[in-house]
């Protein structure tokens, strides 16, 4: 027994070292992309935030030499002058409200349409459902610039829709250069990804569960809300978060289809940076958008955590 004890101890040590070596090997394999992200994304973000706090020296000196209306600090931590200026600006508050409203409304419409298409495909499976799914995915292959311009030309005051109404002697609606036009274009551009995510989640629900619910007397509505949607909850949350993050920071769609004022913060950031030569205020807006997107991303992180927990269980 005493002779075998050292060998058992050595074996146990080897078993402990193997997971450690594997984790270290995995960390080394993942380090190159992490370093690239830190160098080309994380470091510029740190510089931009420092500039927004009034640190205009170092690598921010070139931008500070040509920028206007800057808030410069002598304190080590910076100054909140730029944040105070932007957050108290009535125009920024109005555009922030428009951005949040467009994001919430567009994301809600996208989710409703995506779930309708996904459920129709799952519960019927006919050629009409497959055709509807294919048509819903078509905008995925159309560039956002072309899609935005097409929506504008369709709903513009001199666009296709009003021309058709004019042929019948009617006054057609005008959605071009309006917030409603921005919502329509956002839904058009965001729907394909949401359809793919929701359809994959709904299709993954086992037929046995649906049949069991029907055998128990559950109707279509009860089966949908009690079985299908809870089982596909994680893909639905992922679709909602990606859609919301994509809309809240968008530039092309509101730039082409929206009004000059009020507009979304993506357009405001570009205007302040290029047209007004006020990059410090533009970065403050970017920080606000980043904070809002981070709040949306919390739902995505929670959904992934829940999915991993359920898979581990």
Residue ranges and their predicted role:
Residues 153, 251-279, 313:
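Glycine-rich helix-loop "coupling/hinge" segments at transmembrane-helix boundaries
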Residues 128-131, 177-180, 195, 209, ...:
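Residue-level recognition of membrane-helix boundary sites in multi-pass small-molecule transporters
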Residues 68-85, 179, 260-274:
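Short hydrophobic, aromatic-rich alpha-helical segments embedded in or entering the lipid bilayer
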Residues 1-31, 124-130, 299-313:
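Transmembrane alpha-helical segments of polytopic membrane transport and secretion proteins
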Residues 23, 179-181, 205-238:
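Amphipathic cytosolic juxtamembrane alpha-helices at the membrane-cytosol interface
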Residues 1-22, 28, 56-88:
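Membrane-topology segments of multi-pass transport proteins
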């Amino acid at each position: 027994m005493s002779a075998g004890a050292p060998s058992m101890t050595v074996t146990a040590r080897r078993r402990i070292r193997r997971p450690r070596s594997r984790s270290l090997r995995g960390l080394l394999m993942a380090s190159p992309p992490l370093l690239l992200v830190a160098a080309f994304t994380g470091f510029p973000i740190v510089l931009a935030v420092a500039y927004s706090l009034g640190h205009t020296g170092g690598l921010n000196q070139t931008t500070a030499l040509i920028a206007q209306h800057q808030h410069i600090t002598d304190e080590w931590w910076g100054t909140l002058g730029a944040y105070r200026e932007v957050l108290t600006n009535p125009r920024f508050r109005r555009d922030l409200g428009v951005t949040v409203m467009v994001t919430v409304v567009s994301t809600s419409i996208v989710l409703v349409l995506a779930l309708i298409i996904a459920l129709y495909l799952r519960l019927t499976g006919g050629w009409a459902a497959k055709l509807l799914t294919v048509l819903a995915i078509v905008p995925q292959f159309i560039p956002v610039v072309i899609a935005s311009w097409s929506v504008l030309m369709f709903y513009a005051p001199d666009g296709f829709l009003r021309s058709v109404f004019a042929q019948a002697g009617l006054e057609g609606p005008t959605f071009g250069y309006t917030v409603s036009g921005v919502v329509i274009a956002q839904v058009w551009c965001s729907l394909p990804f949401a359809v793919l995510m929701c359809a994959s989640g709904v299709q993954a629900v086992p037929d046995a569960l649906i049949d069991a619910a029907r055998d128990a007397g559950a109707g279509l509505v009860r089966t949908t809300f009690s079985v299908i949607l809870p089982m596909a909850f994680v893909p639905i949350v992922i679709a909602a978060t990606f859609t919301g993050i994509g809309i809240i920071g968008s530039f092309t769609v509101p730039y082409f289809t929206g009004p000059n004022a009020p507009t979304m913060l993506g357009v405001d950031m570009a205007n302040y940076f290029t047209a007004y030569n006020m990059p410090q205020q533009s970065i403050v807006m970017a920080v606000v958008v980043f904070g809002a997107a981070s709040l949306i991303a919390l739902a995505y992180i929670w959904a992934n955590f829940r999915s991993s927990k359920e898979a581990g269980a």
